[in-house]
Amino acid sequence: MFYKIAQKVMFQMDPERAHNLAIGSLKMTGNSPLNAFYAQNIAPAPVSFMGLTFPNPVGLAAGMDKDGESIDAFHAMGFGHVEVGTVTPRPQPGNDLPRLFRLKPAKAIINRMGFNNKGVDNLVKNLIAKKTDIMVGVNIGKNKDTPVEQGKDDYLICMDKVYPYAAYIAVNISSPNTPGLRSLQYGDLLDELLSALKTKQLELAEKHKKYVPIALKIAPDLTTEEIENIAQSLIKNKFDGAIATNTTLTRDGVSGLANANESGGLSGKPLTELSTKVIKQLATCLNGQIPIIGVGGINSAEDALAKFDAGATMVQIYSGFIYQGPKLIKEIVEAYRLK
């Protein structure tokens, strides 16, 4: 009930202003009695993933809490994990405003944020400051002004800094809003990046005496052959996990709607089937060797179950969470427990 009232107010506001207000409010209330407005008790439904045990299979996707400011509030809502970021080595403002658009009739969102964040050092401070023991994945990317050919260095810098504080590290090479970024998903550039990250991971595991898994986040806009090549590279470089998928550049299911022609990545309900299809193809190619987090267009427990059936071990929500509220977490966990 509270969320429906809050949502009604927020949906009257500019989307990015509403987002910033929400994150600020959650930051202030995460560890106070005021979190009773959104906190919920969710019975455990433990799941093993990448050698870790999560209290339930529902996580918050990257992009909601880029700088890790409201982690404790999302813990109170019952998420099994939170993925913060995307974070870059240096702070950057992202793309010009406006850059976030609701497509309410389609339960969708278009964003061209462009990795706006306060930088990896600021994120590390927030990871150290969090009060709860929730599992936090850190999604890392490259700065916009770093040439793609040198992008590998940005990922290594971020990995080095977040490694001691992350439950796992997600490598984002699939955002459509950083020029040239998606080219890292193909051929030699992909292989070189994954190889360098794996080498760095093993060095850091030795240094910190703990093994932090690494996962690759991929786009939905890939051919079958491209998915096969990515899967082969993941297996070859002994990556621990995959996250499928990021937002799409297609506009299927939203044509004619206000804001549908805005550039950027489309998320939400129109992405549901495409994302599930990619998960299924990727799972087939990986053949059980590497587990998958399914994300993209989960608007109901049924959508989440379809991701599990396609081959995902865990799921993440973002747009569906904005449209449905915290109750969606509980609904998915309960459906998962019964499946």
Swiss-Prot record:
GO terms for molecular function: dihydroorotate dehydrogenase (quinone) activity. The keyword Aminoacyl-tRNA synthetase does not apply. One of its GO terms (biological process) is 'de novo' UMP biosynthetic process. It comes from the Bacteria. Pfam families: DHO_dh. FMN binds at residues 62-66, 86, 139, 172, 217, 245, 268, 297, 318-319. GO terms for cellular component: cytoplasm; plasma membrane. Monomer. Belongs to the dihydroorotate dehydrogenase family. Type 2 subfamily. This is Dihydroorotate dehydrogenase (quinone). It comes from Shewanella sp. (strain MR-4).
